[in-house]
Amino acid sequence: MKRNTKQLTLYTTRGSLIAAMYVLLTLLSSVMGLSSGIIQFRFSEALCILPIFMPEAIPGLFIGCLISNLLANGVFWDVIFGSLATLIGALGAYYLRSLPENLKWLATLPTVLANMIIVPFVLIFAYGAPDSYFFIALTVGIGEIVCAGFGGSGLYYLMKKTFSQYLK
């Protein structure tokens, strides 16, 4: 029983730290004017690669996104569906964790795709964005490719090299 309690404490702590990092990085993006609107560069999306290393990143990312959207005064649909897009991306990364080493970067694709598909609907229907769905999907996709794709891949290789002994 002691081992299970210790393991649960470790998972809860890691998940909470990931949620806090997500909020902090989103706030940093927001201060720079990059985290909302048609063109979004949320630095926090790079963290969506973390489920490859630890399953507790999944609730951490979801809760972090939920808190970030609440702090940004997002409308109800943005808070719900934006957070669900992050949850879908995190689950996708987790299920792609067994990819060969040279293909690990593909684990960032669920985050990119979930946001490209869901966020344009949120921007159009919740905020009344005047642009077409496909244009918004393109602009959101560019931000996701930069932050989740390149940022997440960079974070993966940095963690793999630097922290591998702690990630078992």
For the regions a protein language model found, what residue spans apply to each?
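Membrane-embedded alpha-helical hairpins and interfacial helices in multi-pass inner-membrane proteins
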Residues: 27-38, 66-81, 85-91, 95-168
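Membrane-helix interface "capping/anchor" motifs
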Residues: 50-61, 97-105
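Hydrophobic transmembrane alpha-helices
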Residues: 2-59
